[in-house]
Curated annotation (Swiss-Prot):
This is DDRGK domain-containing protein 1. The keyword Transmembrane helix applies. Residues 104-117 have a biased composition (Acidic residues). It is a single-pass membrane protein. GO terms for molecular function: ubiquitin-like protein ligase binding. Residues 28-335 are cytoplasmic. It is found in: Endoplasmic reticulum membrane. Belongs to the DDRGK1 family. The keyword Cytoplasm does not apply. The chain crosses the membrane at residues 7-27. It comes from the Eukaryota. Substrate adapter for ufmylation, the covalent attachment of the ubiquitin-like modifier UFM1 to substrate proteins. GO terms for cellular component: endoplasmic reticulum membrane.
Amino acid sequence: MGDTYSLVLVAGYLSIFLFIGAIGYFYLSKPRIPSSNVNEQQQQQQQQQQQQQQPQINIEDEPQQRGGIGRMNLRNRRQPIINQRDEDTESSGSDSDNSTNSDNYDDDNGQEGEGEDIGVVAPGIVSNRSGKKIGKKKLEKLKLKDEKRKAREYQEYLREEKKKTDLEKEEALKEKRLEEKENEKLRKEEEERIRIEKERKEDEEYNLLKSQISLQESGITKNEDYDKSLLQLFIKYLKEHKICLLEDIAIEFNIKTNEVIDRIKTLDKQGLISGVIDDRGKFIYITKEEMEAVAKFVNKKGRVNIEQIALESNRLIDFSKKVVDNNDQDPVDTN
């Protein structure tokens, strides 16, 4: 029993010496820190030591109350703490040695480490999902990786949006082309319909004109006889009334006044009638004998004025109405 107690005691002292040696090795192997960051590193070390030494104080108080069994428990409880400190020492030393190699490794494996969750354990100390502590350089690299990942995601988002926009534009262009084709088709159909309608109307007009021409050709003889008889009535009316208003003649034959004047002039040129149209819109019919009598009076007197001609004309010309017999008329020349 005494030997066992001695072995436990020796093992406890050895554990303490190993712990002190590990701490010394940790501080000796730690790289030099610039003077500007000394205070910050000291504060971080003090906080880390306080967190690590807190369970040791509680554990060291237990042997005084529990005896040999307490020392065995103390050794068993210290062992994980020592192992954790050894791992921390190795990780801190490997961070500075592998900084150059990790740069190339990070560039070649851009996707690696993107999913790591980073959390702050203490000021200046960061841990990932696995619980391992991460140095400042590693943290900066992880942040850089995260920024690159976000940049890649943003570029991918832009590409997807551009692709989506291009597809929408292409669909809109297709719809526009289809609409233009449909409008062109409708326009051609409308033009064809208008052309057919126009041809139909032209055919109808042609057929109507053709039928009218046929009717006119069939009624030429009748129209010639009617015009001849109407012309004879016109001449008879002028001879009977002797003095006629042009408006009365137009009303009588259902024609315009201008047509009456033109017809009188035409008949005068043809020698069918003779007379004058005064400035008051009257036509005075004068026979050839009466005109010859007036001409003889002028030739006999030589120089005469208008009053003398008027007086002699009233004496020589008979202005009373006469009934003209159709048999006594001169033959009418329709040519």
